[in-house]
Amino acid sequence: MKERIAQILSWYESDNPGTRANLVRILNHGRLGGTGRLVILPVDQGFEHGPARSFAPNPAGYNPLYHFQLALEAGCTAYAAPLGFLEAGAARYAGEIPLILKANNHDVLHDEKDPLSAVTATVRQALRLGCAAIGFTIYPGSSESRTMYEQ
């Protein structure tokens, strides 16, 4: 194991071996593998901002498999997306890139002073898809932050 990866893992000594193995999996993948640096392709904007606003300028973006291929060709460390996008390609691309399931999402259909994302996926679903991690957005300081921490 490269020294930098071992150093990063030393910060997670209280975590279980599965979590640590997934960290190694992410940190050793892609063009920056082994450097301790990450480039994660996040594709939740279709949910967050709407598919037309997000993908109309590049129609290939409507296809969830496009993003898997983009992440691979770009040498990304991992690919993060909502449940539907990952379900579309997790089996086809199994083991080719670490996956991160975005477990909550928010839309911008109306302005909110204190947004509260909806839980849209579970840890069980992340495990079923072979994900290395989950992503969960929290808005610290909002009146809903306690609810988000509890989720």
Provide a role label for each language-model segment.
Residues 1-43:
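N-terminal basic, low-complexity leaders that serve as flexible interaction/assembly modules and, when applicable
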Residues 33, 38-40, 45-151:
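Alpha/beta enzyme core
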